[in-house]
């Protein structure tokens, strides 16, 4: 079983393919297996690495709640790269993994060839922030006191998951069953330590405006909690592009794998070829007609 030790935590990982490294960072309800449709596709071109976060067996499940935080999630990505002797890599994350990917790019931009930030921003909108904290607190407590199978039934039928269930019942059932087999303790402590305490993307505005790593933002148009944050990220990261997948919810890499893979491949191809450039400031104007007085620094 492939294991690396990062920051004192044993992390399980799966590696397939050869070439430029491409690291996949999973969502709260997933694990390395959640990326199987991407690994099969991208391993033909890249050295793909998918790993289980701390709290997700066979990675370690620390019992100390202080072992879980957004900072730990970021440093585990760095620790994984260090352990595998990878200097720089493309980093692709969904949801919780999208947050970790974004923060990794902000903290360690020299280690990231590019960032794919998918389904990111849940709990960021100011008017929804209090409800988000109430929901997360209550759900974390349930993970720590109720059977994992019960929580999987609830979590996998949320308003941004029903799209996946309706389109692909078999795929959704596999996703549900994998989730139900995970660690309730790991999920409860992850929800308390990561989701409950992480900053809103709107709090990162100044850092986002300084980010120069090529970034692709991907969201489903029925993933309501992530739509507005996705547009915000696009506007603040000058080197970003935004893809909105129609009639899609939160689990976009499994729900719409062909659209997701194609968007990511086109992005990575452009980055690898040096053709992904920062936004022309002249396009940043509220007018649809009158030109901006800003100039393109690359011209």
Task: Label the model's feature ranges.
Residues 9-66:
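Conserved HGGG/HGGXW glycine-rich cap/lid loop of the alpha/beta-hydrolase fold
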Residues 102, 106-107, 112-146, 150:
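Flexible "cap/lid" loop of the alpha/beta hydrolase fold
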Residues 18, 221-223, 247-249:
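Acidic beta-to-alpha connecting loop that harbors the catalytic carboxylate
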Residues 211, 217-219:
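Short beta-strand/loop motif that positions the catalytic acidic residue
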Residues 126-131, 145-207:
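Conserved alpha/beta-hydrolase catalytic His-Asp/Glu region
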Residues 224-229:
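Conserved alpha/beta-hydrolase "acid-adjacent" motif
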Residues 40-43, 49-96, 262-265:
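Active-site loop/oxyanion-hole signature of alpha/beta-hydrolase fold enzymes
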Residues 240-299:
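Catalytic active-site module of serine/aspartate enzymes centered on a nucleophile-bearing elbow/loop
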